[in-house]
């Protein structure tokens, strides 16, 4: 499944069966700018609120996922029957650094996002996704997206975009 939101239910009872019982052996998660990590404690509620469009169940351990590496430790401990590749969601990344602010990122905020994204790629993330029609990704200027995409390039990462407008 090249466009999955299965990460939103990872760890829930029988989550591992949803895809494999349909013959899906690989799924790529973290789509549309939504990923389960990174999460900063001060922005946990905002992250969960944003993700609630896809789930209302959140693991207790989520409050500890300051880094993508911590999230991968959690994911690796779950019962997975499908191969899983994970993108870092731009909305999740943006909330971790600047909450739900309706404005462009500052240079300092962008540098922080780039650092977190670089660490995620070093930890095994497959790429980066945006949901440019959804908040808070829609508040980003083109420069921010380009700069973040540059971070994943040396890793051979994939950039998956949900466009700004569907009209």
Predicted regions and their residues:
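A short, structure-level motif marking secondary-structure boundaries and short turns
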Residues: 1, 57, 100-102, 133-134, ...
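A cross-domain feature marking catalytic cores of carbohydrate-active enzymes
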Residues: 4, 31, 86-88, 130-132, ...
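Metallo-beta-lactamase
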Residues: 1-7
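Flexible loop/turn segments at secondary-structure boundaries
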Residues: 7-8, 34-38, 92-95, 135-139, ...
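Divalent-metal coordination cores built from histidine and acidic residues
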Residues: 12-126
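A conditional alpha-helix N-cap/helix-loop micro-motif detector
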Residues: 9, 109-110, 141-142
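Active-site core of metal-dependent hydrolases
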Residues: 125-167
